[in-house]
């Protein structure tokens, strides 16, 4: 198994900053935005976007944590552990995840969101888009497009969980 770092901490920070600027540029009503981090690493990326929005626009954007396990179609799971303490009706929810692959996690996240309310709009921000979609889902904000083969994996490490920030590509062959 070969593992290669393809994004270091500086490049990751730059990608998150770029996503933040794109969110600012493309949204007229920034005060209606709610960030929805998909557990686990999507939550930490969403927190970083939230911090950058505060620094750049002096905005206090609410953040919710989504657990998609109870809404997945490929895994049967326990109960939903999402943390949604705000009203999402009429808001512009931006789902945030580390990697976009088949689209199944995002579909589950959308199901979770609409089970809690009716947002005006749902967008998607991902740190890495690796392709290979099984569902018609596309990200609105992408940090890095990293085409992979089906056998390769993308591993996102964040300081809060893993002690460092990086993105690695893993080739099992």
Swiss-Prot record:
PANTHER family: BIFUNCTIONAL PROTEIN PYRR (PTHR11608:SF0)
Reaction equation(s) it catalyzes: UMP + diphosphate = 5-phospho-alpha-D-ribose 1-diphosphate + uracil
Top-level EC class: transferase
Motif (PRPP-binding): 93-105
Enzyme nomenclature, EC number: 2.4.2.9
Function: Regulates transcriptional attenuation of the pyrimidine nucleotide (pyr) operon by binding in a uridine-dependent manner to specific sites on pyr mRNA. This disrupts an antiterminator hairpin in the RNA and favors formation of a downstream transcription terminator, leading to a reduced expression of downstream genes.
UniProt keyword terms in alphabetical order: Glycosyltransferase, RNA-binding, Transcription, Transcription regulation, Transcription termination, Transferase
CDD domains for this protein: PRTases_typeI
Protein name (database record): Bifunctional protein PyrR
Family from the record: Belongs to the purine/pyrimidine phosphoribosyltransferase family. PyrR subfamily.
Signal peptide: none
Record-level Gene Ontology MF annotations: RNA binding; uracil phosphoribosyltransferase activity
Example of a GO biological process term: DNA-templated transcription termination
One Pfam family from the record: Pribosyltran
SUPFAM superfamilies for the chain: PRTase-like
Subunit structure of this chain's protein: Homodimer and homohexamer; in equilibrium.
Gene that specifies this protein: pyrR
């Amino acid at each position: 198994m070969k593992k290669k770092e393809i994004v270091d901490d500086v490049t990751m920070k730059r990608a998150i900053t770029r996503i933040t600027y794109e969110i600012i540029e493309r949204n007229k009503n920034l005060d209606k935005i709610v960030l929805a981090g998909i557990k686990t690493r999507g939550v930490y990326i969403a927190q970083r976007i939230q911090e950058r929005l505060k620094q750049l626009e002096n905005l206090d954007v609410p953040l919710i944590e989504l657990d998609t396990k109870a809404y997945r179609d490929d895994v049967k799971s326990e109960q939903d552990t999402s943390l949604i303490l705000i009203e999402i009706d009429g808001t512009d929810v931006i789902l945030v995840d580390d990697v976009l692959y088949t689209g199944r996690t995002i579909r589950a996240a959308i199901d979770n969101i609409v089970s809690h309310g009716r947002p005006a709009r749902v967008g998607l921000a991902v740190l890495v888009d690796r392709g290979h979609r099984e569902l018609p889902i596309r990200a609105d904000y992408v940090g890095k497009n990293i085409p992979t083969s089906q056998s390769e994996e993308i591993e996102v490490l964040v300081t809060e969980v893993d002690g460092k920030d990086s993105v690695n590509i893993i080739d099992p062959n």
